[in-house]
Swiss-Prot record:
Family assignment from sequence similarity: Belongs to the carnitine/choline acetyltransferase family.
GO CC terms: cytoplasm; cytosol; neuron projection; nucleus; terminal bouton
Its job: Catalyzes the reversible synthesis of acetylcholine (ACh) from acetyl CoA and choline at cholinergic synapses.
Feature type site, description Cleavage: K584, F585
GO MF: choline O-acetyltransferase activity
EC numbers: 2.3.1.6
Post-translational modification as stated in the protein's UniProt record: The N-terminus of choline O-acetyltransferase 67 kDa and 54 kDa chains are blocked.
Record's protein name: Choline O-acetyltransferase
InterPro entries, A to Z: Carn_acyl_trans (IPR000542), CAT-like_dom_sf (IPR023213), Cho/carn_acyl_trans (IPR039551), Cho/carn_acyl_trans_2 (IPR042231)
Catalytic activity: choline + acetyl-CoA = acetylcholine + CoA
Binding site for CoA: 496-508, 534, 656
Native species: Drosophila melanogaster (Fruit fly)
Complexes and interactors: The 54 kDa and 13 kDa chains exist as a heterodimer.
Amino acid sequence: MASNEASTSAAGSGPESAALFSKLRSFSIGSGPNSPQRVVSNLRGFLTHRLSNITPSDTGWKDSILSIPKKWLSTAESVDEFGFPDTLPKVPVPALDETMADYIRALEPITTPAQLERTKELIRQFSAPQGIGARLHQYLLDKREAEDNWAYYYWLNEMYMDIRIPLPINSNPGMVFPPRRFKTVHDVAHFAARLLDGILSHREMLDSGELPLERAASREKNQPLCMAQYYRLLGSCRRPGVKQDSQFLPSRERLNDEDRHVVVICRNQMYCVVLQASDRGKLSESEIASQILYVLSDAPCLPAKPVPVGLLTAEPRSTWARDREMLQEDERNQRNLELIETAQVVLCLDEPLAGNFNARGFTGATPTVHRAGDRDETNMAHEMIHGGGSEYNSGNRWFDKTMQLIICTDGTWGLCYEHSCSEGIAVVQLLEKIYKKIEEHPDEDNGLPQHHLPPPERLEWHVGPQLQLRFAQASKSVDKCIDDLDFYVYRYQSYGKTFIKSCQVSPDVYIQLALQLAHYKLYGRLVATYESASTRRFLHGRVDCIRAASTEALEWAKAMCQGEGANVPLESDREDEEESRKVKFSIYSKDHLRELFRCAVARQTEVMVKNILGNGIDIPLLGLREASIEVTGEMHELFKDESYIISQCFLLSTSQVACSTDSFMGYGPVTPRGYGCSYNPHPEQIVFCVSAFYSCEDTSASRYAKSLQDSLDIMRDLLQN
């Protein structure tokens, strides 16, 4: 993983790294002289000697050291099963001909015959016996042998570090939990304290190596899963760069440091709250609550208007990088930035958005389940994703921070998280664990919070005229982006995964086909579709892409629409109810439609399984593309091809975010002309978070949600007995 300063060097590369890992592997886990405690002591001594001889440019070792899971150095029983190279396999490099065959198959439903034929010719040249493809493939195989995860930094840079657009909406998801009922400001402080106490307890569990090992629950069940991303959630932060971003990840020394703090932001004012210190130990919940209460009472009373520094983190990455450089010209600002980066989390204490903020919906939709006053679930999701703009809470954020807990005075709460360090599953599981503990052990009457502690330190920013001007410019830029977001939380309540499973279909596969049908009903075509597939069966595995737009799905969608083509009238659009009750004559029999559906299910399942077992196409294609640049100095024509560009423009970006609580997570589209759609299947309902941009006349979040409703309805009619 990236070190404090280095961001893009290949994981575990270079002779120094190889020597270090050779040294580490010579230690054995057991009792006596080679006990874990002795290993730690020996390791520290070895590193002290190693560091004394290191040069400033020698950074490859950092990635390897920081990639060692903490639990490997613990006394827990299954240490040898936890993310270490000897037990977790490396990400594979699939055979070249297999990747190219699957690539052609993925292009068939989303390209024209002429485009596809051109691509096939390029692939023939690329894959010829004397072509460059075999050479590049061997380059990746060699890279796999030399490194812990040959694809990690290719993928990290492609997905995150090289992207220059703003984080909110475009990259950072927002998550909404069931709202609380706060009667007083003390309730807000106590709830915040309980969340932070849970974060601190989780930190202690990581440090002690007690994080339970997860195993695969499907397809070659019981395989151990890489847990590395769980160790990157707390105390980490993204750093902007003019050309490329980097990551701040806590070093082993910092993980063992007894000082723990969070940064609390209230009304754009920032405070450092120490949760645990070497000179006084861990704060109790009541003591933490007293610190939060101080912030809640102090921030509104300050005479000067606060400097909304957090607003700058919502700007395009290169712009924010230059602003950050200006901030760092003052040493006091440098210290503030360090406190934010090293904080376990950022806690944002918000004011509520107006009830009519960006209000959306459609006639016939089911009512929202959760409300906070006059605010519905869509409104609450806006607050978590972007804060509502410069007049609301967008300056009350630090969008670079991996985890921002957000609590609003009206009971709305959730989080916004920066995506580069971890996938959603690690974030969701951490917050749901803390939330369930709070629900299972309600607040006891602790009386008023204790006030014997010194107050939190308020971070004061020192900015010149140039930065003052940038705040005004950033306000306009951020507000424009937020005004363009078309976002809608839609609950489909006719059925959920209980019915889907009764049809002998995976709920994820079923919903993915519903998303394809909904798109076809509106546009008469399928488009490149992204669904994240976890590759945590492999060392430092993150995700690959399940491409749901298949030829089989296209044939089924065409048949389901009875050949009507694009902009099929939706049942929920019809004003005349009698019209919708008329008998409709089908071109295809139900048996034929069911057979097409089963074929689409089989193909979607096949693609899903290939991806989770490390045999997808997007990671290998990315590797071949980057290898062509590294080996020949230029990108091969195959990756400049129109079909490749189409395949990488994900007009439908989707992901299943399964929550055991009645929570949901949403995000914006990944392209100006596309949709974002997360989903959370429950036994008797499915929650969708649909997003689009108003600046695109061809897309509409509410209309896509309506098409989803109709698609799910007719799929039930097709499959139920």
